[in-house]
């Protein structure tokens, strides 16, 4: 996951230089992800800090949040794979890179191994490999 903003928003408001500065920026979020109006960042020595944010836009889908960020309306957090191209093109700029966002864990729920069909095992194996490769690619 990565905290990003568009160059247009940063030209208008400047770059946040500390986690506390994030409250000065409008924030776009996927509904329910930052329900407490706070985001977690990793500070030095892997210490988690909770930082308040000013949520101005919420959507049930990340694509709407991405569009809002690209339009320069807010800063926000997205999964790295969904905005990798925009970051490479310079349409989104990572913020506070020395305070990374903790990753989400990914889980596959399935019946006990003895009850899992061959097709489900193959699908789970392919999905695991695909996601591992996708999520390990560098974000910026």
Segments from the language model and where they lie:
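Short beta-strand-to-loop elements that line the ligand-binding cleft
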Residues: 29, 50-61, 99
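Secondary-structure junction motif
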Residues: 26-47
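Flexible hinge/capping segments at coil-to-helix
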Residues: 4-30
């Amino acid at each position: 996951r990565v905290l990003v903003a568009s160059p247009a928003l940063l030209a208008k408001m400047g770059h946040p230089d500390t986690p506390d500065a994030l409250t000065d920026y409008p924030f776009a979020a996927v509904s329910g992800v930052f329900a407490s109006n706070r985001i977690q960042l990793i500070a030095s020595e892997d210490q988690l800090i909770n930082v308040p944010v000013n949520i101005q836009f919420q959507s049930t889908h990340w694509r709407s949040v991405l569009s809002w960020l690209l339009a320069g309306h807010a800063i926000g957090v997205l999964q790295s794979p969904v905005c990798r191209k925009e970051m490479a093109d310079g349409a989104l700029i990572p913020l506070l890179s020395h305070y990374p966002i903790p990753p989400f864990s990914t889980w596959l729920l399935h019946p006990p191994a003895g009850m899992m069909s061959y097709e489900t095992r193959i699908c789970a194996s392919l999905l695991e490999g695909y996601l591992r490769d996708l999520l390990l690619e560098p974000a910026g």
